[in-house]
Amino acid sequence: VVLLDNYSLLTEVVANPTAYGFSNATGVACTVSSSLFCSANTLVTPDAANTYVFADGVHPTTAAQKLSAQYALSVLKAPAQVGVVGAAAMTAGQRYAQRLMSYAPNVSDQAWHAFADAGYSKTDFGKAADSKNKYLLVGADRRISAGNVHAGLTLGYDRASGDLGAAAGEFNLKETSVGAYVGKKADQGAIMGYVRYGRLSADIDRNIALGAANRTESGSSKGAHYTIGVQGNLVLGTFANGKVKHGPVGGFAYEKMRLDGYDEAGNTSTSMSFGAQKREGMVASLGYQLRGEFGKVKPYASLSYEVDGTDADNIKARLKSAPTSFSTEAPKSDNGVRLKLGAQIDLAKNVNLVVGAERTFGKDSGQQTVFNLGVDARF
């Protein structure tokens, strides 16, 4: 059962009718005693059904009923709309693993290795909901044993902005993260394990159309994001006189994310309270890659199938004026294919420029485009 507050809504409309597209909130549209017997022939003016708030002493006009329907629909859609923020938060953990492996080939027998990577990504969740993300990731590692085994730490900052849906509102999401990783590189391939922890902060603006008026309800939430996983690749062979290596590439990770529940700041008929958002589960990928070495330029390409096994709890919500809540499903990401293209370019001895682009295919929700640019050094 979803409880609405039509009384407060109509009270707000009566207090400022012109804002909602009405010209009369004190009189009635019908010349007969009850709207049950009212018709186009018994209106006080031909357009009274669209300009008056009340048809008789109790019942709303056609336009006021349409406004009430907009109100009800906005309440029903609200939990799934704010759920886009939780879905957007999950993309940072998956991107982290991709970026670490972009720099793994440059680890050598030098004692230290450091990198900095910046990028942009856009994720589409369907129904005009999306997330546009800018990020910066820096890391440093040290060789801890013979055989190119390195261990390191990372610091990251992600900032996302996006739409909750078509004209449904916007959000801003920030995540500050720390991570640790250990990896080994050999002629036959590389493997890396990692952990990551991020603190989340979100500002959410939800738009509601009510007749001629557009209202915005705002709120804020904080949370946490955990990731642990492993990535690796193997070299099965070469061609082009040994200049191009090829072999499988894959990864496996567990992610958990929570955004705290929050109350919107307003105290109107449309102001709502939302429960916590929780997502967790496994993400896996398996594919094949090519990696070339042509002098100072080392291009790479890979094609992988990704399985997103994360589950999201239903999101609870209620009007702030209502005693009980209801829940709806949160947006989910789909399985799909990821294509990666890029290159490493030698800028100087032990210094490399890394450029890359990624695109997923076959996803109704979670379709993603990524661009990154970075530099790393060994010393």
Model-derived features: positions:
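Outer membrane beta-barrel transmembrane domains
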Residues: 114, 151, 179, 183, ...
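Outer membrane beta-barrel translocator domains of Type V secretion systems
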Residues: 85-245, 254, 340, 356-378
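Glycine-rich beta-alpha junction loops
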Residues: 7-10, 250-256, 303-309
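Primarily extracellular Gram-negative trimeric autotransporter adhesin
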Residues: 74-108, 309-322, 326
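Extracellular low-complexity, Gly/Ser/Thr-rich intrinsically disordered linkers
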Residues: 36-95
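Solvent-exposed, glycine/polar-rich loop segments of beta-barrel outer-membrane systems
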Residues: 16-36, 84-85, 126-131, 165-171, ...
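Sec-exported extracytoplasmic/periplasmic mature domains
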Residues: 12-19, 69-78, 233
